[in-house]
Amino acid sequence: MEIKQIMVAGAGQMGSGIAQTAADAGFYVRMYDVNPEAAEAGLKRLKKQLARDAEKGKRTETEVKSVINRISISQTLEEAEHADIVIEAIAENMAAKTEMFKTLDRICPPHTILASNTSSLPITEIAAVTNRPQRVIGMHFMNPVPVMKLVEVIRGLATSEETALDVMALAEKMGKTAVEVNDFPGFVSNRVLLPMINEAIYCVYEGVAKPEAIDEVMKLGMNHPMGPLALADFIGLDTCLSIMEVLHSGLGDSKYRPCPLLRKYVKAGWLGKKSGRGFYDYEEKTS
């Protein structure tokens, strides 16, 4: 099946990034969010990113306008009836995702592929709430979407070969490298990355070193472009906690137990860069 019309459901950092990347590849994209203000904020965010690219000479003003003209905001989820694929990019919450997939299954025509940008939740379980499990698949983009080249493609137990091939082809058209992985908690990326971040948090919790020192060790000693604690702040500490909880409950191994300090920060509202404070203080930088 040739995919022409795309809807992105969820206009946060990931959703707006996916919409921008798809439009940049020549697709017409509808972007929806249950909160209309969030949809407008998502559009504003991607416009700002495109303008920044133009200032740096990475694209012309004409190209920027062309990309923006291929993105429209949907006022209702009902507009998904026009889509060949819906890429869900809402909060990492199973109840919210399954509810959305039930709704999309009712709205969308039979040929529409329902893809989830989940970073850790089981695709098979999400697909099971629909009447089209063969058309449900995981399409896990990396953050920031316009920059990062990887897309993890995850088949559920019932995902058809045709659906997988269509999504792999779509990812390639969007300028990404599609890597197929199996449907296990955290897939590959977060099963490897998040325990490392969690261990770095334990190093803070146990007084091994300060966040700056830990990040410096990993950058200079392991050639990481960003330290694990700065990366955790960038991802969002609430998201990190959610993924660690999925790994811990899904795999049952104590090595995936979330650090108590991570829980404490999330309960305090210290979520990282988006809240102004996490392992680093971002409020001073923005004031």
From Swiss-Prot:
Tell me if Lipid metabolism is a UniProt keyword of this record: yes
Catalytic activity, as annotated: (3S)-3-hydroxybutanoyl-CoA + NADP(+) = acetoacetyl-CoA + NADPH + H(+)
Instruction: Provide this UniProt record's keywords sorted from A to Z.
Output: Fatty acid metabolism, Lipid metabolism, NADP, Oxidoreductase, Sporulation
**Which GO biological process entries does UniProt record here?**
butyrate metabolic process; catabolic process; sporulation resulting in formation of a cellular spore
Task: Please tell me which top-level EC class this enzyme sits in.
Answer: oxidoreductase
Q: Which InterPro entries match?
A: 3-OHacyl-CoA_DH, 3-OHacyl-CoA_DH_CS, 3-OHacyl-CoA_DH_NAD-bd, 3HC_DH_C, 6-PGluconate_DH-like_C_sf, 6PGD_dom2, NAD(P)-bd_dom_sf
Q: What is its EC number?
A: 1.1.1.157
A Pfam entry, by short name? 3HCDH
Q: GO: which molecular function terms? A: 3-hydroxybutyryl-CoA dehydrogenase activity; NAD+ binding; oxidoreductase activity
Site description Important for catalytic activity, residues in chain: 140
Which pathway features in its UniProt record? Lipid metabolism; butanoate metabolism
Q: What induces its synthesis?
A: Subject to catabolite repression.
The UniProt similarity line reads: Belongs to the 3-hydroxyacyl-CoA dehydrogenase family.
Spell out the protein name for this chain.
Probable 3-hydroxybutyryl-CoA dehydrogenase
